[in-house]
Amino acid sequence: MRVVRVVFALVLLSGSLSSAVAPPRSIEISANDEMKYGVTEIRAKAGEPIRLRLVSKGTLPKIAMAHNVVVLKIGTDPAKFIAAGMTNRETDFIAPSMSSAVIAKTPFAGPGETVQVVFTAPAKPGRYPFVCTFAGHFQAGMKGTLIVS
């Protein structure tokens, strides 16, 4: 009888472990030389694991036209965040003083490259801005919103 209980407990435990670690949901965003994201709104559940893939479909050299996705905390002013990082090329145009506002970020992608970041959607429902930090891209409209419910 004890063996049956142990086996039953192991079966229950293995089932709860496999459901506790859900694989991340993949979301793909394209970017181009026109400084636009292919997707500007992402919806996620609070605490949901996300794999965010950025596909650069441009043709201009990476030194002139790279793209990334930086997800910011609620309450962060994207325009001020971008302005603060304009001279920080070595940190992907993210001011060290503003790095605590970043929830997740991809590396820069050049033409034909795909980059990604895996993160957990915030636990707090709300609207989280995301931006491209490459110089001039946010101002050209390269921005969007992660909506967490």
What are these regions (language model features)?
Residues A22-I50:
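N-terminal edge beta-strand
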Residues S100-S149:
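Extracellular/periplasmic metallocenter environments
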Residues V21-S30, L72-F93, H137-S149:
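Extracytoplasmic/periplasmic copper-protein system
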Residues A64-K73:
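Short Gly/aromatic-enriched secondary-structure transition segments
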Residues R43, L60, F119-A123:
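Short, flexible loop/turn segments at beta-strand junctions in immunoglobulin-like
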Residues E90-I103:
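Short beta-strand and strand-turn-strand segments in soluble, beta-rich domains
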Residues V6-S16:
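Bacterial N-terminal signal peptides
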Residues L54-T59:
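Short amphipathic, basic-aromatic surface patches that mediate peripheral association
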